[in-house]
Amino acid sequence: MSEPMKPMEIEQRSFEIITELLGDRVLDPENELVIKRVIHTTADFDYADNLTFSDHAVRKGIAALKGGCDIVTDTQMAKAGINKTILTRLGGEVHCFMSDPDVAQEAKSSGVTRAFVSMEKAAALEKPCIFAIGNAPTALLSLEQLMEERKATPALIIGVPVGFVNVEISKERIIEKARAPYIVARGRKGGSNVAAAICNALLYQIKR
């Protein structure tokens, strides 16, 4: 009976299989590790086609992380999935304000969504931030509105909300307006796990 594979061996073999299954497909070298990390997380090769990157988005995201920026997510799941060991070493931390009592109260009293208030709260942070949105298209639309009003200047937008209502519109608006560097999963696919995977793909490149 052969010895069980160690976690790192499993991951290495998984990436070898991904490379094999991509075949002759040529990926942009700057974006390749992000795309493969998302495929590894989801087992979905559609991400080789639907992940869209603004010019040098990966490079800019890595530079922001090296500079100690924070990461803002729209779910606790995405927050939990991000490698905090590397992020903390770089001087950053992860925030998710969606379930904060003050956010809920402000949303109720103002008649707006918690997503908008949470993005507004994040925009008020003193440090540069990467916004990793994997669940709520309203958070992405709110962030775009705040950028239009010059109240938010993201270091990078990871726009990968999943679903059917306002999802594609929110993503396309980020791409069309291009007010900040972005990594967007076009179409309906995405999720908190995808948002976390993209953050980790950037962090792991710094680790190396």
Label each PLM-derived region with a short phrase.
Residues D49-A64:
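A short, well-structured juxtamembrane/interface segment
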Residues D74, I157-G159, I198:
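Buried hydrophobic positions in well-ordered alpha/beta secondary-structure cores of metabolic enzymes
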Residues V165-R208:
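C-terminal functional extensions of proteins
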Residues L87-L125:
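Long, charge-dense
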Residues M1-P29:
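Charged, compositionally biased N-terminal leader segments and the immediate start
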Residues A78-G81, T138-L143, F164-E168, G191-A195:
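Short glycine/serine/threonine-rich phosphate/pyrophosphate-binding segments
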Residues V26-H40:
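N-terminal glycine-rich anion-binding loops that anchor highly charged ligand groups
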